[in-house]
Amino acid sequence: MSPIRISAISYLNSLPFAWCLEHSAIMDKIDLSYDIPSQCADKLLSGEADIGLIPIVETLRMPEHYIISDLCIGADKAVRTVVLASETPLANISTIYLDSHSRTSVALARVLAQHFWKIEPEWIHFSGDITKYPRSGNSAAVVIGDKAFGMQSPYVYDLAVEWREFTGLPFVFACWVANQPIDKEFINRFNRTLNGLFDNINAIAEHYSDQTPAGVDLLDYWTNNISYPLTADKREGLKLFLQYATHVVH
């Protein structure tokens, strides 16, 4: 039997998943690769991967998809690593530069701009280092991932907090998704493996301590910012977001 090809996210928020997979017997059954979120989705869409930890908005592009895990990359409150960095208060923003690494975060910013912030900025896809976006008086940028830590801008808006204030619900950034039905026995093993993060979170933080940006407490980030269980509230938030996102995804 061919190994199941899994594409996982290469950010700090998903390192607990990586550790659990790499320290389990399931490694004999899988071909594991690490990518930025948008590449995880592209691999799943092209058939280069069977399972991916993908930005949830990508499911709108998939003719067939299955959420196969009760774990996700989510946030009940501030997530810290998905932000709108701005030179001006929200009401004055005229241009927003977009990070290409995750289409979910871009879609979330568009939803919030239209329905919550009530602004109509110009949206510009930025191919370079998003932390170096053109800083004019009324510009802003969607910044995601590890580079969002310590983002230096006059105004930094956490998009998970903004979504919570808008809807009263938590937000789901990424889920484990398959592009075809997967053997149930494998899915059960896969989920048991991933759930090992809760019992091993301290050891995982120690394991990756040398990969941590200065000033970042991994354990605090994983326990107080990232929320891994895909709860009923998160599923409700996910469903609502996809309803909004259908109208802003291009």
Identify the function of each model-found stretch.
Residues C20, V82-L90, T95, F171-E185:
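A bilobed periplasmic-binding-protein/Venus flytrap-type ligand-binding module shared by bacterial periplasmic
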Residues I4-S10, S94-T104, A109:
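Short beta-strand->loop
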